[in-house]
Amino acid sequence: LEQEDSVKKGEKKGKKKKVFLFSLLGLLVLILSGLGYYFSSTTGPQVTVYKLVTAIEHKDYREVASILSSEKDKWTKEEAQSLLDYMTSQKIDVIYELDHIAQSSKTGIVKDKKQNLLIGIEKANKKFGIFQEYRITTYPLEVTATTNLDDAKLKTSEKESTVLKKNQTTKLGKVHFASRDMQLDGKTEVGKISSGVKLDPAQASKNKLNLTFNSEKRLLEVEFPEEVSNPT
């Protein structure tokens, strides 16, 4: 009898341990599921898009610029507004496009009719090595310039100027997909010139833009009054 009692007690203890382990395992699954839902709701592409959409709807271009910026690449609010204005001019609903990407493929790119890459969603780091984070990304313009002017120089910003080689293609580097005002200086046969010029992303194709600055000779035709051409 004592042996039977001890066996029964052992079986009861074993069952209690199993129940405890299963309960602990179930609780752990619930915790992990909750954490998974929490982090997916705070790191998913919809969260990133929502922040940008909110800034766009409030016309907070400074915040838009902050979202578009990275540690090595900073946008200004003027550039951010220019990019949004360009997409509007091309009848691109950036809010709809990004939301569609976030809900379907999670990553993707918004393009225009000329195959310019404008804005997109891409994978970033993984939180705790598990939960995928996403970020808004932009794509630069690769700009070149050609000119027939002598001693040409193009001032692309307050701190940057580039000497343009005559009758050659000069690389100006990569810039944000946004309009910008620039200053062109050079020489022609009749003397020095200095003119304000504009970088217009609408002229770009496949994220490449070539700026042409040429002086042209034109024949000027003048008609004089009859009394001037036939003096008496």
Question: Model regions: which residues?
Answer:
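Gram-positive cell-envelope targeting signals
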Residues: 1-84
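A short, solvent-exposed beta-strand micro-motif common in secreted/extracellular proteins
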Residues: 170-171, 175-195
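Short solvent-exposed beta->alpha transition segments
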Residues: 40-41, 65-118
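Structured interaction patches on ligand/partner-binding surfaces of diverse proteins
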Residues: 108-125, 187-216
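Structural motif
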Residues: 142-153, 223-230
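Short, solvent-exposed S/T- and G/P-enriched segments that are highly enriched in secreted/extracellular
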Residues: 157-176, 232
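Extended amphipathic alpha-helical interaction segments
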Residues: 141-146, 154, 160-163, 184
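Conserved "repeat-terminator" motif of extracellular CCP/Sushi domains
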Residues: 134-138, 207-226
